Amino acid sequence: MILFYFMQTPLYYVHKHLKAKFTNFAGWTMPLQYTSIIEEVRAVRXRAGVFDISHMGRLLIEDPEKKLQYFTTNNLDKLSVGKVQYNLLPNEKGGIKDDVTVYMLSEIEFFLCVNAANRQKVINWLSPHLKLRDLSGELVQIALQGPKSEEIISKFYPVSDLKYYRFKVFDKTIISRTGYTGEDGFEIYVSPEEGKELFLELVKLAKPCGLGARDVLRIEAGLPLYGNELSEEITPIEVNLEKFVDFSKEFIGKEAMLKKKVKKKLFGLELTEKGIPRKGYRVFKGDREIGWISSGTYSPTLNKGIALCFVDIEERKEGNEVEIEVRGRRVRGVLRKYPFVRTPAGRYQK
């Protein structure tokens, strides 16, 4: 008999107290929802929501010789102390080992936030070449997202002057103006003890939200998820992330990335009939299969089914009428550019 053990974040019993419903994700037991996914999505869009995202990996890297530059697609020379950069860790084939955010703590110190499922893979990939310390167990990570997030976080920390993709350090706490929802927001890295207290204070002012709402929000915002839109086989070019790849510098897999013949690229899809698109559903133009869905959901904001999908390059046209196959039947839709939801804080995107 094989037993599977799922890890719990330091806030697990806080979530139990708040009557969260749990799910297993990337080896972790995480809140899926507290009330309903729809309510939580609407709370973030209209006011603010708070998420425990402590399952993410947090790595500290010392890099006096600037070796990290070769392991990233974006140019670390564009960073300065106090800035955050969205980045990709490429493999030898030009695919993606992980997508990460890089915080420049000092001229030689970098703090990386990596995906939960890829934490050990990234450690194994980088540690033979760089001095690396895994801080994942020493910090909790809380995301406060929504148009009222600045007003709320300012009750606890003086960060109202913080620009997007910037961060401040308060003792051992890091606060960045970053997020994964398309809304304005902050991510807080803090000790487990302080994190429990902070989370309980934040849920008095913002709605606690689970991974269900987080996934809907990121699809509405057109943001990729590793394992769906990103993988070791998919290049940044195929997911329209070229702006995060500096081809003027050297990095692992650069030549392979440029040589790969791209036949399909990521695009958006909205259903014009009732239905919910899901990962793996096929996309058709007439009788011809032109692609597949990588992520799909019902959008409470738009009141319709939406999806991210890989489709033939020549079919990537706004308003192109298509169909998806849902349990043996065809459902009509149209191709759309993403993000699907454009908020006043639309600049708050990766």
Swiss-Prot record:
InterPro entries xrefs: GCS_T, GCS_T_bac, GCST_C, GCV_T_N, GcvT/YgfZ/DmdA, GcvT/YgfZ_C, TrmE/GcvT_dom1
Entry keyword set: Aminotransferase, Transferase
GO CC annotations, alphabetized: cytosol; glycine cleavage complex
PANTHER family: AMINOMETHYLTRANSFERASE (PTHR43757), AMINOMETHYLTRANSFERASE, MITOCHONDRIAL (PTHR43757:SF2)
Protein task: The glycine cleavage system catalyzes the degradation of glycine.
Subunit structure: The glycine cleavage system is composed of four proteins: P, T, L and H.
Name this polypeptide is given: Aminomethyltransferase
Naturally occurring in which organism (per UniProt): Aquifex aeolicus (strain VF5)
